[in-house]
C-alpha cells in the first residue's frame, strides 16, 4: 500500500516522551508520507528541541518531516521542508532560507487562483480545505470535491486535502483526486485510545 497520510501534530504537546512513543507507533503503520510539526504559542528553542527528537523517527521510518510556518526552524533541524500559509512569507523567500530541493507546501484554501500561483512559483504541493467541519483549526473556507478533480486534471504535482477528514470520509477525498489526506484530530483526539489503531482504520 502506498503512503497517503499527511499527519499533523497536535497544537500543544505537553509530555514529549509520551508523544514520541505514540508518534513512533503510528509511523509503523507505513502509510504516513509526511509529518508536520505544528505547535502554536511555543518558544522556538522548545520546538527545535522536540524537532531534534522527531527527526530521528522520521528518518528511521522514511517520513518527510515538515515544519509549519517557519523555514528557519526547518533549516536548523535539516528537515525536508516547511508548510506556508497565505499570510506567511513568500515561496521565493523561503527558498532562499532552505536548502536546495526542500519541500515547500502552500495552503490554498478553496482557490484555483492561489493554487495556480503557488505552482507557478515552484511550490512542491498545495493544500486545499476545509472539506468538512473541523475543530482543529478555525476556517472560513469550504472546499468542494470538484476542486480536487480540477487540480488533478490541471497539475502534475501533489495535492493535499485537509479539514475534517477522517476514517469514514477519506475514500471520497482520495477518489476525487487528492494525493494525500491531512489529518490531526482524527488520530490524536480519536475515541480509540491507541493512535495506531486510528491510523490503521484509514487503510480499510
Give the location of each predicted region.
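Catalytic cores of alpha/beta
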Residues: 65-81, 94, 110-124, 154-155, ...
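Catalytic domains of carbohydrate-active enzymes, especially glycoside hydrolases
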Residues: 23-35, 121
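Active-site mouth loops of central-metabolism enzymes
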Residues: 2-20, 103-110, 160-161, 165
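Alpha-helix-loop-beta-strand connector modules within alpha/beta enzyme cores
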Residues: 48-67, 93-111, 139-167, 200-204
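Glycine-rich phosphate-binding active-site loops on the catalytic face of alpha/beta enzymes
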Residues: 7, 12, 84-94, 127-139, ...
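Generic hydrophobic/aromatic pocket-lining and core-packing "Φ" positions
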Residues: 23-24, 51, 71, 91, ...
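Active-site beta-loop-alpha junctions enriched in small/polar residues
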Residues: 8-12, 40, 70-72, 87, ...
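Glycine/Thr-rich beta-alpha phosphate-binding loop at enzyme active sites
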Residues: 32, 77-86, 106-155, 190-195
